[in-house]
Amino acid sequence: MGSRLRFALLIALLGFVLLVWNLLSPVLSLLLSRRVGTRVGRHGIAFIFRGCWWVAERLGLMRIDAASLDALRDEPGGLIVAANHPTMLDALLVAARLPRGVCVMKAELLRNVFLGAGARFARYIRNDAGRGMLRDAVASLKEGGQLLLFPEGTRTVRWPVDAFKPGITLIAHLARVPIQTVLIESESPYLTKGWPLLRAPPFPVVIRLRLGKRFAHDPDHRAVLRALERYFASELVDERRAA
């Protein structure tokens, strides 16, 4: 079976599974309490994407090294997980490893037929709600959630990282939780800015996710933001030089 056919099968399988989950999610949300439903919703998304990447690797389409993130699964208390954002796959790769993960999503994705109902069931957070987004993010962290944020705000255009947007370090300060960095490295162009979902890249797509430095929350959240941006830029440059 050629790589393009395997790629098409993977996309079709993922679309089918997500569609089924999005049909089930509204029903489950009516049957389960808020607390239990949120837990089921987040674990369900992690299970779906972990299975998807397992299939992708078995088909020879991807090689993923993300095992280091498993150390965060059972860590108690709230935590912000901050990652650079080279491709559209990043959130799905991290979510697969974090069953307590909470994503901040564009409003249009929360209306998407393949993602919306499942994301609402998991109580993911809209990124266009202003102070409401801050309030929801802090509340989720205080409930023990692991909040995934991309400080660049969108996929990287200028390597190694684009300028970081304010907000992540303010949320950490308000919730009094640390920021755990995750460095994502890939030389594949697939789903980088402007790359369409259905356009097949050279295979296999090789992606590595590794845990980086952890930053404490601080009242001077702007200084922490600057330090965070410098850290990501330095680590990604050093990693490429060492490769």
Label each residue range with its predicted role.
Residues 59-67, 127-131, 191-194:
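Short gly/ser/thr-rich secondary-structure transition/capping motifs
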Residues 73-76, 141-143:
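Glycine-rich phosphate-binding loop signature in dinucleotide/nucleotide-binding domains
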Residues 25-50, 58-59, 74-129:
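Catalytic core of membrane glycerolipid acyltransferases/transacylases, capturing the structured
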Residues 1-47, 71-74, 187, 219-243:
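Membrane-interfacial terminal anchoring regions of lipid-handling membrane enzymes
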Residues 61-63, 100, 121, 144, ...:
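A generic structural signal for alpha->beta connector loops
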Residues 4, 131-243:
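Non-catalytic C-terminal accessory region of glycerolipid acyltransferases
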Residues 63-64, 126, 147, 179:
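Hydrophobic beta-strand scaffold residues
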